[in-house]
Amino acid sequence: MAPKKDKAPPPSSKPAKSGGKQKKKKWSKGKQKEKVNNLVLFDNATFDKLLSEAGKQKVVTAATLSERFRINGSLARRAIRELVSRGAIKMVCHHSSLQIYTRSTNEKVNPTAA
């Protein structure tokens, strides 16, 4: 009697697995930033609020005004120009992309006390 041939598994196109069986990794859903709905034009209430409160802030930048008053970035830059012209804030440091301002104090500079 001829010896029985063991059935060999049919050849597959997949390479042989090594190691234990692992779950397939799932893609995580990317986090999406919430869209902000900022004002593009000033209304009277927002402009009056800006004039009264922005001069009291320690640090004034376009980003802080945009976040606090919910206004557009370009509108915040125009508001800063208006506040500087009124003397409510003064420039501390400027860079090509960021200008930093602070509240104006009504101190008189003594030229002889240097």
UniProtKB/Swiss-Prot annotation:
Cellular component annotations (GO), alphabetically ordered: ribonucleoprotein complex; ribosome
Compositionally biased residues, Basic residues: 20-30
Pfam families: Ribosomal_S25 (PF03297)
Location of region: Disordered: 1-33
Keyword terms of this UniProt record: Ribonucleoprotein, Ribosomal protein
Similarity comment: family membership: Belongs to the eukaryotic ribosomal protein eS25 family.
Official protein name in the record: Small ribosomal subunit protein eS25
Gene that encodes the chain: RPS25
